[in-house]
């Protein structure tokens, strides 16, 4: 490409942003515990086994615990280290609660339960070594996606039920099943975690009378203190199923007393658009009488699970945008990508075959939020800027850090050739896209063959480099040109990506719009994220309105993610504050220009 091309690249990110998890730790943002008297050591030593763990990056905090990535000094195996200061375990009931949590969790081993790998202590801390769940929890998924597609909900719920079946077989009642305690590994497998409220049933028919703490999805029999047992977990799964399909919890109000009143009265409604089979299962689980609810072992025999499609795997892209379920698995060309042609074993009502011509792309109409969350982002930025975060007597920016909000996708490289063709860019997963001057977009996935084409009206088509309509030949050639340029000039080419099962359902966010000013380039993705790359010092902001968070990459290429509401509370440095003020102006510009052409002319 000629000298007319302008290029940019993203700074060095952490080892793999967006791939961290905090099993067993409540959502960050719970009231922060008082700072421990002692510093957490850099190397944690288990005195019994002599194993040494090197403390890595911060993963999050909640309740009394802080969580870090830790790695075995010898094997290099990576875990999540839950670290609790003993200064916060002074009362007998606090120590007993921690002991009970460890005692129950260490007795469990199942594919859908967070792995427990040991615990030890020194004079100042208790250390718990847990399986690292790199894709966080269903809570972050819910914040980004709200209502899921029915096959996704089935996929997650099946695994939750399997994990809970195991707990109940082992006489354990979890008592706090909620989105934030359902963690996800790299393969998007569910892992049940946080056994802080769990209890063990000592004899058949035992009804537990007390419960320390407030579960999110609390069952009516717990509120009435009449005694409760395994049925409370089925109630919670009913609440989870409702939340996954509807996009909000069934009894949610702004006031806890009102919520509890609704639970006692069983006052909730299921929207009309929910599949009657799904609605029926929710109603069965959310019955006030615990004995009327299905048992955990009966759930998977329900029609919701037996008659609907359950994907074997889901792609990582599902964490931020819906998958391609408009291509029903059996409607694909049988010779095309085997995993999708195989429906669940024992499926009662397989979808009818709908053969298509080889070159006919699969089309999906996109239902996009009108302003793609820009109004929410503007409000969030207005709020944080109005608090004057850098004008504090004491700025505690590190307290606002929330790694759970790390973006799933961002632009890692870009190249401006809009005088002729458009803007080319690469996402952090090594996929490459072009927003052409005619307002169409084309994305090449990191497998080097799959393509996603988005027309001016937002209609999406899925095709491949090896099989596409002739009308797209020129655009595919240009896309390859952009890709080769970025590989050669901006960063060394990424390693070959091994396709994983589930990738055939992937849909990537695309570049919705962009513009340049004298100071920066502003990029707006279809998942709502806005990225601002500053030219002079190469600092960057990635704003996510759904997580209400900002990722700041400073001059040292340090990559940190903050919750905007916590920056209001704890303050931030002048450098970040000035960039947040600039971001507000740019988001305002995006909003006022959204009806204009995709290539906004900056003044």
From Swiss-Prot:
What biological-process GO terms show up in the record? Answer: centrosome cycle; double-strand break repair; double-strand break repair via alternative nonhomologous end joining; establishment of mitotic spindle orientation; establishment of protein localization; female meiosis chromosome segregation; G2/M transition of mitotic cell cycle; Golgi inheritance
Region called Disordered, residue ranges:
1-35, 338-364
Task: Report the residues modified as Phosphoserine.
Answer: 103, 137, 269, 335, 375, 450
Region spans: Activation loop: 194-221
Q: Where on this chain does ATP bind? A: 59-67, 82, 131, 178-181, 194
Q: Consequence of mutating residue 492 to R?
A: Severe mitotic defects leading to prometaphase delay. Increased localization at kinetochores leading to increased levels of phosphorylated BUBR1
Q: Where is the composition biased (Basic and acidic residues)?
A: 351-364
* Linker, as annotated region: 493-507
Compositional bias (Low complexity): 13-35
Q: Which UniProt keywords apply?
A: Acetylation, ATP-binding, Cell cycle, Cell division, Centromere, Chromosome, Cytoplasm, Cytoskeleton, Isopeptide bond, Kinase, Kinetochore, Mitosis, Nucleotide-binding, Nucleus, Phosphoprotein, Repeat, Serine/threonine-protein kinase, Transferase, Ubl conjugation
| A GO term, aspect molecular function | protein serine kinase activity
- Domain (Protein kinase): give its ranges: 53-305
Q: Which reaction does it catalyse?
A: L-seryl-[protein] + ATP = O-phospho-L-seryl-[protein] + ADP + H(+); L-threonyl-[protein] + ATP = O-phospho-L-threonyl-[protein] + ADP + H(+)
Under the heading Gene3D superfamilies, the entry gives:
Phosphorylase Kinase, domain 1 (3.30.200.20), POLO box domain (3.30.1120.30), Transferase(Phosphotransferase) domain 1 (1.10.510.10)
Similarity remark: Belongs to the protein kinase superfamily. Ser/Thr protein kinase family. CDC5/Polo subfamily.
Query: Mind telling me what this protein is named?
Result: Serine/threonine-protein kinase PLK1
Source organism of the structure: Homo sapiens
């Amino acid at each position: 490409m000629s000298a007319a091309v302008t290029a940019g690249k993203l700074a060095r990110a952490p080892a793999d942003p967006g791939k961290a998890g905090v099993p067993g730790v409540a959502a960050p943002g719970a009231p922060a515990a008082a700072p421990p008297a002692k510093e957490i050591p850099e190397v944690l030593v288990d005195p019994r086994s002599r194993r040494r763990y090197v403390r890595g990056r911060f993963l999050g905090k909640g309740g009394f615990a802080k969580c870090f990535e830790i790695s075995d000094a010898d094997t290099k195996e990576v875990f999540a280290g839950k670290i609790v200061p003993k200064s916060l375990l002074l009362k007998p009931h606090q120590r007993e609660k921690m002991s009970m949590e460890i005692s129950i969790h260490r007795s469990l081993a199942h594919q859908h339960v967070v792995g427990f790998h040991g615990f030890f202590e020194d004079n100042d801390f208790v250390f718990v070594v847990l399986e690292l769940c790199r894709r966080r929890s269903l809570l972050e998924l819910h914040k980004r996606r709200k209502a899921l597609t029915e096959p996704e909900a089935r996929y997650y719920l099946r695994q939750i039920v399997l994990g809970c079946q195991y707990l109940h077989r082992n006489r354990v009642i979890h008592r706090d099943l909620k989105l934030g305690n359902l963690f996800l590994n790299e393969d998007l497998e569910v892992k049940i975690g946080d056994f802080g409220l769990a209890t063990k049933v000592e004899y058949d028919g035992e009804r537990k009378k007390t419960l320390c703490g407030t579960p999110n999805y609390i069952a009516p029999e717990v509120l009435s203190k009449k005694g409760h047992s395994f049925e409370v977990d089925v109630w919670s799964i009913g609440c989870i199923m409702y939340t996954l399909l509807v996009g909000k919890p069934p009894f949610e109000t702004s006031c806890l007393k009102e919520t509890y009143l609704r639970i006692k009265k069983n006052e909730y409604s299921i929207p009309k658009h929910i599949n009657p089979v799904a609605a029926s299962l929710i109603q069965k689980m959310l019955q006030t009488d615990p004995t009327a609810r299905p048992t955990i072992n009966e759930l998977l025999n329900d029609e919701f699970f037996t008659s609907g499609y359950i994907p074997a795997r889901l792609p990582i892209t599902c964490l931020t945008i819906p998958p391609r379920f408009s291509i029903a698995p059996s409607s694909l060309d049988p010779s095309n990508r085997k995993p999708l042609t195989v429906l669940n074993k024992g499926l009662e009502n397989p979808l009818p075959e709908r053969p298509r011509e080889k070159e006919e792309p699969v089309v999906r109409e996109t239902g996009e939020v009108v302003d793609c969350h820009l109004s929410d982002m503007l409000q969030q930025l207005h709020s944080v800027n109005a608090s004057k975060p850098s004008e504090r007597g004491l700025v505690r920016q590190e307290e606002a850090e929330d790694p759970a909000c790390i973006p799933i996708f961002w632009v890692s490289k870009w190249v401006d050739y809009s005088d002729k063709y458009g803007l080319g860019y690469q996402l952090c997963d090594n996929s490459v896209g072009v927003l052409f001057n005619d307002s169409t977009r084309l994305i090449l996935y990191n497998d080097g063959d799959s393509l996603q084409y988005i027309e001016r009206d937002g209609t999406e088509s899925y095709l491949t480099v090896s099989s596409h309509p002739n009308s797209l030949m020129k655009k595919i050639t240009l896309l390859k040109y952009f890709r080769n340029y970025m590989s050669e000039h901006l960063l060394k080419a990424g390693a070959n990506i091994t396709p994983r099962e589930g990738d055939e359902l992937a849909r990537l966010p695309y570049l919705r719009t962009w513009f340049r000013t004298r100071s920066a380039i502003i990029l707006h993705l279809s998942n709502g994220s806005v990225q601002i790359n500053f030219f002079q010092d190469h600092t960057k902001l990635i704003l996510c309105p759904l997580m209400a968070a900002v990722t700041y990459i400073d001059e040292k290429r340090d990559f940190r993610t903050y919750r905007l509401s916590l920056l209001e509370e704890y303050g931030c440095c002048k450098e970040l504050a000035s960039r947040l003020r600039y971001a507000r102006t740019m988001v305002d510009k995006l909003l006022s220009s959204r009806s204009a052409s995709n290539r906004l002319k900056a003044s």
